[in-house]
Amino acid sequence: MTEPTTPAASAVHGGPDAPIAVLHSRIRIEERLLLEEFDRRKVAYELLDSRTAVFRPDELRLPYRGALSREISHTRNVYATRILEHAGLTVVNSHDIITTCGDKLLTTLRLLASGIPTPRVMVGLTPDAALDALDGFGYPAVTKPLTGSWGRLGARLKDHETAEAVLEYKAALTGTQHQITYVQEYIDKPGRDIRAYVFGREVVGAIYKYSDHWRTNTARGGRPQVCPVTPDLEKLLVATAEAIGEGVLAVDLLEGPDGEVFVNEVNHTPEFHGAIDVLGTGMVGRYADYVLGRLDPR
């Protein structure tokens, strides 16, 4: 690893021996595992901390051959990846994927445009408008912020009284994302979700996430177990990847009471340390294989 630097206007575009920029702000378990894999393969990389990076778009020349984004701030991720692409770099994941998957409504629209089965959604441009329409949409339902992870600020709306209390609270919050009210039908799932990992158009593996709570995120204590990748599931996952774009994706799916499978969300900077506990550490190597294949095409 080379020492991190602040991008400067005087830097030159990197050639095939130049380092890969690893965009980040925190080094979590996933980033550490990927960097250890790069070290093992003697891959040159440079840590690019989004909290200190400064760019000059009018004189942008960067000393990298490509970039891997593992940034956890959605806003910084969106703008940094666009700047890196403006400099002519291939970025995994791309600005388009990060912009789309980082916004639940944009993800839903992309899925619907490709005919991917996804839960019914209603969008109110104000919380009050959403509340007025919910009786027709139907209860129970789920409201989520447009951006965010780990199920934070998501709420299950059992009835009108619950919705009134939750949406009144949302209306008092500042920020545009709290005013745009994204409501999804509640899927009565069998105590579990599915998370599947797709690198490019290859399904790497899938896990069930079991929980007694309606939110099954492993970060919230969801228990992972191996999920068999059936031909039907693989077909759905590949179609989802084609709809979103080629990259490193974690696809969250819900099983309905009649056996239907819905794509719920698509994650662009996925955590995977819980998955490798059941799928094995080979996932890290395949992640690195995919990134290097995109950045160093032969």
Regions found by a protein language model. Give the residues of each.
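Glycine-rich phosphate/pyrophosphate-binding beta-alpha loops
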Residues: 267-280
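Active-site nucleotide/adenylate-binding loops and adjacent lid/helix of ATP-dependent enzymes
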Residues: 2-4, 14-17, 24, 60, ...
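Protein kinase-like catalytic core scaffold
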Residues: 141, 182, 204-205, 249, ...
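Phosphate-binding site of ATP-dependent enzymes
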Residues: 156-244
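A long amphipathic alpha-helix within ATP-dependent nucleotide-binding catalytic cores
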Residues: 215-263, 285-298
